[in-house]
Amino acid sequence: MNPRLKTLVTCVSLGITSLAGSGAMAQEKIKIGVSIPSADHGWTGGVDFFAQEAKKRLEAAYKNLEVVVVTATGASDQANTLEDLVAAQKIKALVILPYESAPLTDPVRQVKSKGVFITVVDRALTDSNIQDLYVAGDNPGMGKIAAKYFVDKLGGKGDIVVLRGLPTVIDNQRYDAFIEGIKGSQIKLLDQKYANWNRDDGFKVMQDFLTRFPHIDAVWAQDDDIAIGVLDALRQAHREKEMWVVGGGGMKQAVKRVLDKDAATPVDIIYSPSMIGLAIEVTAVHFVSGLPVNGRYIVDSPLITPENASQYYFPTSPY
């Protein structure tokens, strides 16, 4: 976690404990809208959980604060919910994790034009000038860390396939950093396809790769849900001993495999859905304390290995 974010987290904690009931919000009702994708896979399920937890904490601490959490099944559905949040709910701030980057950029711009404070989480908009605050994991770092691991473990040469997420800014950041990281090596990228951060699509895409490529040394799945689908495809094809898989996110099932030294999933990379809770809390503190929280706040994405996996394994976690 970078120093600026550490300071911000401290401010959030102090804001919740010391400003609650202080009268800082006595003059007006503050309504924060939170727009997130529906829980269509494990990571977004974690996002919904941490958003609801932040809502409970903040509404208990600040009696004049209301947090409205809405989910969307797609980009167009999310755009429609934004209209309702502004027109019917009359929000003063929007915390949004866009379903996709490009289709949500103009709808969020329209919300901004109404004087609403904009916090963007994770999947960036295509126009960063719209946002007041951006909170995300280190997406270029994920790609860079994964690339270094692949180069080191493969000894600088081998055949790999890549399963991407959705066509979003953060997916491009991860992928571009990964490709840059393997440049100069003899690692050959056989193919790359979108798997929509979904285990079922990960299964289908990997089935296609297995059919077309008789030899694969390793798989970068980029996401733990996708990785689960990939592993299922490998087992069904009886090729699970031929290659290893690296996902990302820090899902407890993936971390447990790393902890157990599963050869098929030797490492993982953290990208926690709890960042949504941080984004909501920081946005709230902006209103109740007047603290300047504009800017970009990037959460580190460390490599999980068998040596440090116990630090990241939480059996009771929803993700």
Describe these PLM feature segments.
Residues 1-10:
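Bacterial N-terminal signal peptides that target proteins for export
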